[in-house]
Swiss-Prot record:
It catalyses: 2-deoxy-D-ribose 5-phosphate = D-glyceraldehyde 3-phosphate + acetaldehyde. SUPFAM superfamilies: Aldolase. Catalyzes a reversible aldol reaction between acetaldehyde and D-glyceraldehyde 3-phosphate to generate 2-deoxy-D-ribose 5-phosphate. GO terms for molecular function: deoxyribose-phosphate aldolase activity. Belongs to the DeoC/FbaB aldolase family. DeoC type 1 subfamily. Its main location: cytoplasm. Keywords: Cytoplasm, Lyase, Schiff base. It is an enzyme of class 4 (lyase). This is Deoxyribose-phosphate aldolase 1.
Length: 220
């Protein structure tokens, strides 16, 4: 198992500078992480810098609120892919989910999946804002919409991934859809908990610390 390929090395802070983007790109190349995950404004630059590597470019859509229109999310997705994005992490319409407007939620996801045309789409449901039944429903809608992953969190809503939520999401979607845990995964212990719960991708700014923990752990 290549643990480095579980990691989307992430920098989504609004104040991120080019120097900081360079740092996570260099780290991702050094450790051969699955991707770097950056805001759309950095996608083109990251794609150019990663062109000679296996590391993919991941970006975020409708982020962090999920409250932009479906048409806006679709355009953002198209623009990101034209700029070199390989993977798309979109935020659902959380208010629509809570209203019970499930068709709206599913159609919002479907619009992004359609524009992404074969690029990996991960759907952020923001678990910290949802109850048990809402997590289940959001996971079901993600699967029905044809997305590749259901993802826990943006990291901007006051909480992140828990192993319990990851397990619930995985139990809901089954083998056809993968689970990405993000938000608060800061060390090897957190990483292991998420993987054991069913996550096959980890979004973290602490990718280097996680890998250093793996290197220091005699079990690996």
């Amino acid at each position: 198992m290549k643990f480095e390929k579980y990691i989307d090395h992430t920098l989504l802070k609004p104040e991120s500078t080019r120097t900081q983007i360079d740092q996570i790109i260099d780290e991702a190349k050094a450790y051969n992480f699955k991707s770097v995950c950056v805001n759309p404004t950095h996608v083109k630059y990251a794609a150019e810098r990663l062109a000679d590597s296996e590391v993919l470019v991941c970006t975020v859509i409708g982020f962090p609120l999920g409250a932009s229109t479906t048409a806006t999310k679709a355009f953002e997705t198209e623009d990101a892919i034209q700029n070199g994005a390989d993977e798309i992490d979109m935020v659902i319409n959380i208010g629509a989910l809570k209203d019970g407007r499930f068709d709206d939620v599913q159609q919002d996801i479907e619009a992004v999946v359609k524009v992404a045309k074969g690029h990996t789409v991960k759907v952020i449901i923001e678990t910290v804002l949802l109850d048990h039944d809402e997590i289940v429903k959001a996971s079901e809608l993600t699967k029905a919409a044809g997305a590749d992953f259901v993802k826990t969190s943006t990291g901007f809503a006051g909480g992140g991934a828990t192993a319990e939520d990851v397990k619930l999401m995985k139990d809901t979607v089954g083998a056809d859809v993968e689970v990405k845990a993000s938000g608060g995964v800061r060390n090897l212990e957190d990483f292991n908990k998420m993987v054991e719960a069913g996550a096959t991708r980890i979004g973290a700014s602490a990718g280097v610390q996680i890998m250093q923990g793996l290197e220091a752990d005699s079990d690996y």
